[in-house]
Amino acid sequence: MEVKATTILAVRRDGKTAVGGDGQVTLGSSVIKHTARKIRKLYKGQVIVGFAGSAADGLALMERLEAKLEEYRGNLLKASVQLAKDWRMDKYLRRLEALLLAVDREHMLLISGNGDIIEPDEPVLAIGSGGDYARAAALALYRNTDLSAREIVEKSLKIASEICIYTNDKFVIEEI
């Protein structure tokens, strides 16, 4: 059975970064949870990570990233590169089906099991079932308003929740 879940969105503006995620988890054609927490603060609260995909896989990858952050003293870019290498090369990790979105004060990264580490051109990044909707809304708000990063995340996730059937309006938002 296919699990569909998640919209995760990150926006940086005026030195603040907000990352938000919805709480819906869908199994087949049924919503089985409304308040899942898909974002976490790592490394002494200096990094925020969200995942899209399998919950077990996403949480396992978050744990791996946290270990890499400890190893590289909070350097998100180095930790992400090493995680992506391991994810791509390790027989067990290769099977994990999730995407990570990770941010600190300097970087905003999408990390995949294909070895991708993508930093967007603009300070807006989204993953998950409703990611494209949230990203489009966030870019429009970022380019055309003076809203804060948090306000853009809230409004964009709300728009995504009105379009994507796999996204609800029970948001968790973290800021650094």
Curated annotation (Swiss-Prot):
Top-level EC class: hydrolase
GO cellular component: cytoplasm; HslUV protease complex; proteasome core complex
Localization per Swiss-Prot or TrEMBL: Cytoplasm
Top-rank taxon: Bacteria
Main location: cytoplasm
InterPro entries for the chain: ATP-dep_Prtase_HsIV_su, Ntn_hydrolases_N, Proteasome_sua/b, Proteasome_suB-type
GO-annotated biological processes: proteolysis involved in protein catabolic process
The UniProt record lists the keyword Hydrolase: yes
GO molecular function, one term: threonine-type endopeptidase activity
Catalytic activity annotation: ATP-dependent cleavage of peptide bonds with broad specificity
Disulfide bonds: none
Similarity comment: family membership: Belongs to the peptidase T1B family. HslV subfamily.
Protein's name according to its UniProt entry: ATP-dependent protease subunit HslV
Organism from which the protein derives: Aquifex aeolicus (strain VF5)
